[in-house]
From Swiss-Prot:
Name of the molecule in the record: Inositol-tetrakisphosphate 1-kinase
Residue stretches in coiled coil: none
Keyword vocabulary terms for this entry: Acetylation, ATP-binding, Hydrolase, Isomerase, Kinase, Magnesium, Metal-binding, Nucleotide-binding, Phosphoprotein, Transferase
Organism: Bos taurus (Bovine)
Catalyzed chemical reaction(s): 1D-myo-inositol 3,4,5,6-tetrakisphosphate + ATP = 1D-myo-inositol 1,3,4,5,6-pentakisphosphate + ADP + H(+); 1D-myo-inositol 1,3,4-trisphosphate + ATP = 1D-myo-inositol 1,3,4,5-tetrakisphosphate + ADP + H(+); 1D-myo-inositol 1,3,4-trisphosphate + ATP = 1D-myo-inositol 1,3,4,6-tetrakisphosphate + ADP + H(+); 1D-myo-inositol 3,4,6-trisphosphate + ATP = 1D-myo-inositol 1,3,4,6-tetrakisphosphate + ADP + H(+)
InterPro entries: ATP-grasp, Inositol_tetrakis-P_1-kinase, InsP(3)kin_ATP-grasp, ITPK1_N
Residues engaged in binding 1D-myo-inositol 1,3,4-trisphosphate: 18, 167, 199, 297
Domain ATP-grasp: 117-325
Chain positions recorded as Mg(2+) 2 binding sites: 295, 297
E.C. number(s) listed in UniProt: 2.7.1.134, 2.7.1.159
Length: 419
């Protein structure tokens, strides 16, 4: 057993539904076997009374959204949480609240992806054009759509990327269909991808790719089809069987995602936001073979990730070891160590594939100043050309204070009314 873990304390706050779905008590038991004390936090009490805490794991997405709606109880919970973080910059937070707010806003997360792709300059990546609609469609809507590179058919999603309603989407095929769009929302070009979605589940330096069913191909351009309304969660369930996912035939390119591309995208998001627990939805354009990021999720469900608890514990051990050895200073973003590709083929699960990243594996991301650093756009959580830590704990170095990090993220993060 790694002796440096003994006596460490990990606090967590998850909804009861999330705890049951993940069977998080099993993770707590796994931690205890390694000498780590696990504490379920009660945000209705001062966190100070429940500390000290070396690590906090949370999914406060519901609470943050309620606070943004001026719910007094949620505002108090978020304030109490932030107050503890500000008072204890040594505590590792998985994941920072400003980053979570960015991922809760599809418009902002899509803009971040656009900047990351422009920085990476990788022809294998080309996510669809998007645009935010803040008012009902009017006479100039078509002009705005065209100016932003959008063309029929396109997919319409809620701006908020969390909650039951966030899965309610529509495919619009013509101008008449615009009348049913309810702002605020984000519209995104629909890319044919042979009805296959790849869900990338990231835990620190590890990630697992799981194949899921997705929407079938549709003809490009305007058509007289009526808009299709659907729930993306239902469509992309592992066992989903729907007329929307029934592919008549495979068209054009049918390729697997590149492990290298996924590794660099994951690493770039970790660098830009300082997140450790997130999911990326990727499709492969059946005309070009390019990877397209169509959504990013904070602390997803990790369905199909059999080693989630092991990966999470290893990540916690890694960041705690870095903290205790003094190597967790600014400037280090370790390349992703391995991935597991659990693609569900017609005959069942494909064999697990592991990739160990060498120091040069992500060379295209090294030695360049990314556009999301403060000097470039005030959109990231770094300073100058300094790369941020994979776990990006708030105030993890003397040179980066919590208030400065929050300021740096402000142009991309959704600001809650509690702040």
């Amino acid at each position: 057993m790694q002796t440096f873990l003994k006596g460490k304390r990990v606090g967590y706050w998850l909804s009861e539904k999330k705890i049951k779905k993940l069977n998080f008590q099993a993770f707590a038991e796994l931690c205890r076997k390694r000498g780590i004390e696990v504490v379920q936090l009660n945000l209705s009490r001062p966190i100070e009374e429940q500390g000290p805490l070396d690590v906090i794991i949370h999914k406060l997405t519901d609470v943050i959204l309620e606070a943004d709606q001026n719910d007094s109880q949620a505002l108090e919970l978020v304030h109490r949480f932030q107050e503890y973080i500000d008072a204890h910059p040594e505590t590792i937070v998985l994941d920072p609240l400003p980053a979570i707010r960015t991922l809760l806003d599809r418009s902002k997360s899509y803009e971040l992806i656009r900047k990351i792709e422009a920085y990476m300059k990788d022809d294998r990546i080309c996510s669809p054009p998007f645009m935010e609609l803040t008012s009902l469609c009017g006479d100039d809507t078509m002009r705005l759509l065209e100016e932003n590179g959008l063309a029929f058919p396109f997919i319409c999603k809620t701006r908020v990327a969390h909650g039951t309603n966030s899965h309610e989407m529509a495919i619009v095929f013509n101008q008449e269909g615009l009348s049913a769009i309810q702002p605020p929302c984000v519209v995104q070009n629909f890319i044919n991808h042979n009805a296959v979605l790849y869900k990338v589940f990231v835990v620190g330096e590890s990630y697992t790719v799981v194949q899921r069913p997705s929407l079938k191909n549709f003809s490009a351009g305007t058509s007289d089809r009526e808009s299709i309304f659907f729930n993306s969660h239902n469509v992309s369930k592992p066992e989903s069987s729907s007329v929307l996912t029934a592919l008549d035939k495979i068209e054009g390119v049918f390729e697997r995602p590149s492990d290298e591309v996924i590794r660099e995208l994951s690493r770039a998001l970790r660098q830009a936001l300082g997140v450790s627990l997130f999911g990326i939805d990727i499709i492969i354009n059946n005309q070009t073979g390019q990877h397209a990021v169509i959504d990013i999720n904070a602390f997803p469900g990790y369905e199909g990730v059999s080693e989630f608890f092991t990966d999470l514990l290893n990540h916690i051990a890694s960041v705690l070891q870095g903290q205790s050895s003094g190597v967790a200073g600014a400037g280090d973003v370790a390349p992703l160590k391995h991935s597991r590709l659990l693609a569900e083929q017609a005959g069942g699960l494909a064999a697990e594939r592991t990739c160990s990243a060498s120091p040069g594996c992500c060379s295209s991301m090294m030695g360049q100043e990314p556009p999301w650093t403060p000097e470039a756009d005030m959109g990231g959580v770094g300073a100058g050309s300094t790369a941020k830590l994979p776990h990006q704990r708030l105030g993890c170095t003397a040179g980066v204070s919590p208030s400065f990090q929050q300021h740096c993220v402000a142009s991309l993060a959704t600001k809650a009314s509690s702040q």
